[in-house]
Regions:
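A short hydrophobic beta-strand segment most commonly corresponding to one strand
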Residues: 119-137, 252
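Short acidic-glycine-tyrosine-enriched beta hairpin
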Residues: 92-109, 239-256
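Short beta-strand His + acidic residue motifs that chelate non-heme Fe in jelly-roll/DSBH
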Residues: 69-71, 88-89, 111-118, 215-217, ...
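Bacterial N-terminal signal peptides
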Residues: 10-20
Length: 256
């Protein structure tokens, strides 16, 4: 089989973004799904489960400030905070704040709600088992979240342990520098999702390319999937067209 050789480069990877307005989010919003929620919520489907990459379904969910779901259940899910401030609560447990870089693992079939804090929008990755079906006789509380429950969650949520991000990069807090012959200059890494996790996803590694940085031609035995979060970059399969990448783009490089 012909090897899939590719390279990745950055024209500039220093996207400046803010969350000062209702929808100033780093990744595209996608489809309006507000009819299923309280407030305004969008979903952007990024990765569908298939037999080549064997990855869980992966979407971006964006909540306007004060927007939230009802109590619900689904297959095992892992949430990664992208921007803003979010809330998550399993029924009967303490609510927790979610900030960029926070990871929440949600077991299959556990009733919970999630959404934005009342004074800030929130964007998150959701990685989950889209094939899960509740076992026969599975009992779980579902239904609307009351305003009182939402207010209590806002007032009493456990704080996030995530450190402040003073970097120009989206997941810049806690990055480590990497210098190898594979790159023309230093890149910066941070593991944002380890294994094992609820979604049964491979680990996620955030790689920041400073402006003008690129890697050599290379291939991956098991393939690679890239989700662009910052700035402008380039990707090319050897012999193929050069792709210009923007936040929200997904690149699939097949196994070699």
């Amino acid at each position: 089989m012909k090897k899939c050789k590719s390279f990745i480069a950055a024209a500039t990877m220093s996207l400046a973004f803010t969350v000062s307005s209702a929808w100033a989010m780093p990744l595209p919003l996608g489809t309006d799904i507000s009819d299923r929620f309280h407030g305004t919520v969008h979903r952007n489907d990024l990765i569908a489960t298939d037999e080549t990459y064997n990855l869980p379904q992966t979407n971006v969910i964006s909540f306007e400030a004060g927007s939230y779901s009802g109590w619900h259940v689904h297959g095992a899910m892992t949430v990664i905070g992208i921007a803003g401030t979010g809330l998550y609560q399993e029924r009967g447990k303490e609510a927790v704040l979610i900030r960029p870089g926070d990871v929440v693992n949600i077991p299959a079939g556990v009733p919970h709600f999630h959404g934005a804090a009342k004074d800030a929008p929130f964007q998150q990755f959701v990685i989950y088992d889209s094939t899960w079906k509740a076992p026969e006789g599975h009992a779980a509380h579902t239904g609307a979240l009351t305003e009182e429950q939402y207010e209590e969650a806002n007032e009493n949520a456990a704080p996030s342990a995530m450190q402040n991000n003073d970097s120009e990069f989206l997941f810049g807090a806690g990055m480590t520098e990497l210098t190898t012959p594979n790159f023309n200059s230093a890149v910066y890494l941070r593991k944002i999702l380890g294994t094992p996790n609820a979604a049964n996803s491979p680990e996620w590694v955030y790689v920041a390319f400073p402006a003008g940085t690129y890697n050599r031609w290379h291939s991956h035995k098991t393939g690679q999937v890239l989700i662009v979060t910052d700035g402008i970059g380039y990707h090319q399969i050897k012999g193929g067209a050069l792709e210009v990448l923007h936040p929200g783009d997904v690149v699939f490089c097949p196994p070699n």
